[in-house]
Swiss-Prot record:
Primary subcellular site in the record, as a coarse category: plastid
Species whose genome carries this gene: Glycine max (Soybean)
GO biological process, one term: aerobic respiration
Pfam family of the protein (one): NADHdh
Quaternary context: NDH is composed of at least 16 different subunits, 5 of which are encoded in the nucleus.
Function: NDH shuttles electrons from NAD(P)H:plastoquinone, via FMN and iron-sulfur (Fe-S) centers, to quinones in the photosynthetic chain and possibly in a chloroplast respiratory chain. The immediate electron acceptor for the enzyme in this species is believed to be plastoquinone. Couples the redox reaction to proton translocation, and thus conserves the redox energy in a proton gradient.
UniProt-listed NCBIfam families: PRK06076.1-2
Keywords: Chloroplast, Membrane, NAD, NADP, Plastid, Plastoquinone, Quinone, Thylakoid, Translocase, Transmembrane, Transmembrane helix
Protein name per UniProt: NAD(P)H-quinone oxidoreductase subunit 1, chloroplastic
Membrane topology field: Multi-pass membrane protein
Cellular localisation: Plastid, Chloroplast thylakoid membrane
Amino acid sequence: MIIYLTEIQDIHFFFRLESFKEIYGIIWVFAPILILILGITISVLAIVWLEREISAGIQQRIGPEYTGPFGVLQALADGTKLLFKENLIPSRGDIRLFSIGPSISVISIIISYSVIPFGYNFVLSDLNIGVFLWIAISSIAPIGLLMSGYGSNNKYSFLGGLRAAAQSISYEIPLTLCVLSISLLSNSLSTVDIVDAQSKYGFWGWNLWRQPMGFIVFLISSLAECERLPFDLPEAEEELVAGYQTEYSGIKFGLFYVASYLNLFISSLFVTVLYFGGSNISIPYIFVSDFFEINQTYGVFVTIIGIFITLAKTYLFLFLSIATRWTLPRLRIDQLLNLGWKFLLPISLGNLLLTTSSQLFSL
């Protein structure tokens, strides 16, 4: 009888252990996603605060200072206000398109964060086509803007949506050609492999030095994709009131601003990953683990250092993007399209041909 009870206890313990493993597996699946969403949310709030402080400094005025220490909670207060404001719907508009448009813009950008290697072994999904996934998903966001403009039943909103689609098409092609050049140099479309390919020679192994023209074209194209000044024609206040945002209010209006800053952040992250070595410390011939005299088995410490390096490089480009917005005037629509089709496209195509030729001769 004692043996029988012991066997029963072992079976019960085994089943409890299996259930704990299942629960742990579920937690392990959702924990990185929740951490990523929390980090993205905090980053967006930080970017909004940085933009207000930088713009205040450029315009020689005082920025937000009362809501929290140094005004850091001002963006949170504005978001809370928009959350409780009424969502107005145009009486003759298409309600379904009007409601779905902002969500498509935000969700399509959030998915792109899954292929960003923030640090050593810290990437949500290491896909073999990581950079192309970002390009494919980023081309979906203008569809949401076009749906919003059409569903608003407003001529200014519709023109803003058309401008967003035209601008996206004009600058998506040069950006894709620049990414192809980077992929040829790294022999991979995976973001993790692209970062590893730049880590062999430290600072001088960055793709910035191997692709200077591609970097300039990519930087301009990414700013145009984010619809930031001097490329914010889809929402030009003097011409289109607020573009595709004209009829929106409440949380739906706030989603467009969230999408704008999410897009700016992901573009800066891809500049860091593709051209500035990602999470590498960038000291020639010295890796992070060797520099701190630790082994890669101490993954948490290495990952934290990698995340810090990645974000430091990313916020440098965020600062440049914000400073550009508050110092340069807006282009006309013809100037914007001419820049994309007549200048950036030939330069990026020539850069791709040169990269392909150099790779063929090096075989």
